[in-house]
Amino acid sequence: MALTVAKSALEAIREKGLGGFMRMIREEGFMRCLPDGNLLQTKIHNIGATLVGVDKFGNKYYQKLGDTQYGRHRWVEYASKDRYNASQVPAEWHGWLHFITDHTGDELLSLKPKRYGLEHKENFSGEGDAYIYHSKGHTLNPGQKNWTRYQSWVPTKTQ
């Protein structure tokens, strides 16, 4: 694999020159690969792959049919290089990515424009925008339920 990376790097230097190669490295996000090994693996895996599509969030979807193991030949490169998780993949691309369908997300949107009822939003659990469920009796619940099940007897005053 290292030989493939070195060959493609030398080929890119020959085609674009050293300045163009350095510009490509910066634009494609290879500098961000230094602290993030997952991104580096994705970038190396992208060599020889075809870009299948880009979703509305900027995520790029790739496919490599040659010498790649089945089940590992479709992947996503997230738009956010520093903060990413699987919930950033919209529903229309999820089916293609997990081999449920061979239609890409763009094809699914053209086949059925209103396929999914809600607009996709990533999961913000554990972050500032997270929806936090509070039970009925929780003090932070705005509609806190009064759990008093009885009313104490108050004698009537006679005059």
Swiss-Prot record:
One matching Pfam family: NDUFA12
Location of this chain's protein in the cell: Mitochondrion inner membrane
Top-level taxon in the UniProt lineage: Eukaryota
Entry keywords, A to Z: Electron transport, Membrane, Mitochondrion, Mitochondrion inner membrane, Respiratory chain, Transport
Mitochondrion found in the keyword field: yes
Disulphide bonds in the chain: none
Membrane topology type: Peripheral membrane protein
Annotated GO CC locations: cytosol; mitochondrial inner membrane; mitochondrion; respiratory chain complex I
Thylakoid in keyword set: no
GO molecular function: cobalt ion binding
Job of this protein: Accessory subunit of the mitochondrial membrane respiratory chain NADH dehydrogenase (Complex I), that is believed not to be involved in catalysis. Complex I functions in the transfer of electrons from NADH to the respiratory chain. The immediate electron acceptor for the enzyme is believed to be ubiquinone.
Assembly and binders: Complex I is composed of at least 49 different subunits.
Family: Belongs to the complex I NDUFA12 subunit family.
Protein name: Probable NADH dehydrogenase [ubiquinone] 1 alpha subcomplex subunit 12
Species of the source: Arabidopsis thaliana (Mouse-ear cress)
